[in-house]
């Protein structure tokens, strides 16, 4: 690869082809680019802004050089946020995944340790004694026996370790921050994604259209990368784009302090447990129900109304199904 030619094109604000960014990613994993060249690449693309095809090419490279998670069921969903909203909320997406699984839907949750908050998905899962694995037999047993499997990103996306130190040293986020939500190694056909701004919503909307999956992208207008119920929120799916108000769905408006994830991993885990045990604050429970409901709607492909999806999510908590699902998950994966 002629890296000098790539840099010249980037400096001239030219776009790279999907195959080219895939090759760039593979070259990084082979040690063909120096740290200085990787740093320059990340900086140049960040300054110009990444295109849909460029992002998809980097995604292709990560999936090709990573460990696949071949699950033996056809339809399952991942619920994830981009992170970086600096709101330090509790583990809303992760909790929602167990509510969705408790409602009878298959979930392949892809996650990692926290980058900007107190507790990420992997933190709260590990806090309960779960051992991460890339063993396909164990992964398939988990999704088939309790409806949910957890895919710890560091075991699968091998390419990320080649840029980890450089990303940490740079004083700004890079396009690698955008890749996390779209490199689930099981390649789910359904995804619900929370983004922290409308520019990201537009980008992922085009990305998902090209990937060809069923999706919902959500953004709270006040900057949360999930449905926060603190005010209006926007939802973009395969079929519609709409702004909702919490009261449109029968929910009270939440206060920002009710979403806080605590000061420690242990406090974050306590909130996670409280929601599944149906002892959480009403706002915490409602936020999880709202997020889970839109995930269920993606899985249903319009066969259920949003109100019915909300009822399914609420019942998953109220009848104890979400909690039983989590206990079975911990039992299988510890």
PLM feature spans:
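Hydrophobic pocket-lining residues that define ligand/cofactor binding sites across diverse proteins
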Residues: 45, 100, 208
